[in-house]
Amino acid sequence: MSLCRQNYHEECEAGVNKQINMELYASYVYMTMAFHFNRDDVALNGFYKFFLNESEEERQHAIKLMTYQNMRGGRIVLQDISAPPQLSWNSGLHAMQDALDLEKKVNQSLMELVAVGERHRDTHFCDFINNEYLEIQVQSMKKLSDYITNLIRVGNGLGEYTFDKETLHGESQ
């Protein structure tokens, strides 16, 4: 038993381990998206950079949760990371729509985690999840929604290429 553990329920600890897996899974999916757009037959460097950045952000979220788990006296239990459901996308629009769906799943998981903390009256736990994660999730969902709206507006082909260059700042490597 950890010396620093206080009011940290086993259900909160298990929930953090589950969320670590969710964040690593999201990182894995975003990395798959990034390297799809980096392929020579897709060549949308802005999408590549955007999704690579999202992958790193999700990985950092997992690391922050692992640090928190240790700080509260919990134990990190890593689980297998599921393979992404797909390996390629027909367009940037479809990838952004999948990214929005993923962010909503992560957000739902975080909200369920807060509910666990509330059930066990762990205010520190709830504050941590609310302050470090939920606001960022809402911002990500808004950004992706805006991107989807604009990708629908500009269409495939030249519109998608222009979005890649102008909005995502894709440049030739």
UniProtKB/Swiss-Prot annotation:
What GO cellular component term, any one, is given?
A: cytoplasm
Q: Where is the Ferritin-like diiron domain?
A: 6-155
Give the main EC class. oxidoreductase
Q: Which UniProt keywords apply?
A: Iron, Iron storage, Metal-binding, Oxidoreductase
Give the highest taxon in the source lineage: Eukaryota
Look up the EC number in the record and give it. 1.16.3.1
InterPro entries, A to Z: Ferritin, Ferritin-like, Ferritin-like_diiron, Ferritin-like_SF, Ferritin_CS, Ferritin_DPS_dom
Could you give a GO molecular-function term held by this entry?
ferric iron binding
Q: Where does Fe cation 2 bind?
A: 58, 103, 137
Q: Which reaction(s) does the protein catalyse, per the Swiss-Prot or TrEMBL entry?
A: 4 Fe(2+) + O2 + 4 H(+) = 4 Fe(3+) + 2 H2O
Q: Which residues bind Fe cation 1?
A: 23, 58, 61
Q: Which CDD domains match?
A: Euk_Ferritin (cd01056)
**UniProt cross-references to PROSITE patterns, sorted A to Z:** FERRITIN_2, FERRITIN_LIKE
The UniProt record lists the keyword Zinc-finger = no
Cross-referenced Gene3D superfamilies, in alphabetical order? 1.20.1260.10
Q: What does this protein do?
A: Stores iron in a soluble, non-toxic, readily available form. Important for iron homeostasis. Has ferroxidase activity. Iron is taken up in the ferrous form and deposited as ferric hydroxides after oxidation.
Q: Could you give the subunit structure recorded for this chain?
A: Oligomer of 24 subunits. The functional molecule forms a roughly spherical shell with a diameter of 12 nm and contains a central cavity into which the insoluble mineral iron core is deposited.
User: What PANTHER family has UniProt attached to this entry?
Assistant: FERRITIN (PTHR11431:SF75)
Q: What family name appears in the similarity comment?
A: Belongs to the ferritin family.
Could you identify this protein by its name?
A: Ferritin-1 heavy chain
Upper lineage is:
Eukaryota, Metazoa, Spiralia, Lophotrochozoa, Platyhelminthes
